[in-house]
Each structure stands twice: as C-alpha cells, then as structure tokens.
Amino acid sequence: MFGFFFVAFVAVFGIVFFISYKLLEDREDTDSDWSSSQSPEPDYFQQTQTAPWELKYNKGKQGEYQLGQVLNQLYGYKKILYNLYIFKEDGTTTEIDALLIHPSGIYIFESKNYKGWIFGSENQQYWTQVLSGGRGKSYKHSFFNPIIQNKVHLRWLSYYLNQYTPNLYSYIIFGNDCQLKEIHLNSDRHKVIQTWQVIGAIDRQACQSQVYLSPEQIDDLYRMLLPLTKRKQ
C-alpha cells in the first residue's frame, strides 16, 4: 500500500514539476518576444546610450524605438535623431523624443507609448488616459498635453536653427496599443496619430510640401543637430 502511495506521489510531483517548468518556459519566451521580434537599430542605441535589454523594461523607450523602425521604412534619403536636448532662454533644456530630417522638412515627434483610451483637446492643459480595471471598473490618469510639449520643442528648435529653418511639422505619436477616443484639434498644425499611421501621414505631408531639401542640406542639418543628442539635463 505504501508503495502505491509513493508511486502516486512521485507521479503527481512529476506532473506538477513539468507543468511549472513549461509555464516558466512560456513566460520567458513571451518576455523575449518583444526584443527578438525587433531588428537592431544601432543609431538609436548609440544616440540614446540605451542598451538593447533596457527596452523590455521601459515603455517610453520602446515607443521611441518602434517609431524609429517605422521612420526607417520611409522612402528616400533621410536622417533620424533621438532624445535631443535643446536649451531654452532660462538655461534649462527641453527634450525632443525623435526628429526626422526629410526632403519635405523636419518632423518633430512627441512619443506617448500608452494603453487604454485617450481623450484630449489642443487647448486643454491635461489629457486623460482611461484604463480598464476589470469587472466593469476603469481608472483615469491625467498627463500633460503633448501638443503643448511639442509647441515648446518647435519654438526652441526654430530658435536654435535661426535662419536655417525649413518646414517644421509637429507630430504626437501614440502607440498601437491605445485607442484615440476623442481628440479635438483646432487646426492641422499638429497631427495626433498612432505608430501604424506614421508612414501614410508623412507621405501625405510630403506631397503637400513646397520645400525640397537635398541630401547635402539634410546632412548639414543632421550635423548641426547631432550634438544635441549628447546633452543631458
């Protein structure tokens, strides 16, 4: 009788151990899915001084990186910069998440890698993120209006470039895991879109542009702006 219970105990223990091992293995595979599905982009890591493994634990950096991968798919000659620190009049800095130098001009991106529902309008100081809490509950989180943030970026970038200022475009980019439920804009000066919409939006903007930057001009602007990625607050 004892032998029967012992064999049964060993069998149950073995099954539990096997299931636990598989669950752990599946979890590790899931954790590695994000990083393994991304092709490396040396410019991002070099400019931001971010290690590839850090992306898995930082949603903000994930959003910037994913945006960079999309921008790299744009046709034609271009340059991309990340985390530019531009000095303001009072000596403090304002940070641009990502910037694209394109034949049609300069695109300034404020990246928000959020989930849930997003509500906001151009003139509100704060926007709202609504997250599901399960069982019919929801939680609200306020965050500073990203359009106002980008207005500051545009102002001081224009000041920094001085006379050498092509068209400047303001883009607020939300991640693909959210829903832009109610976004009210007063004009078309700012675009509020998701990552999957970026290529189409820039292609349309480029078609309407009266500016054409040559590869030499793009390189000049890149050399002018690259040092700003080295500055820290």
Stretches with model-predicted labels:
Residues 1-94, 101-106, 112, 117-120, ...:
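Surface-exposed interaction regions that form or flank ligand-binding interfaces
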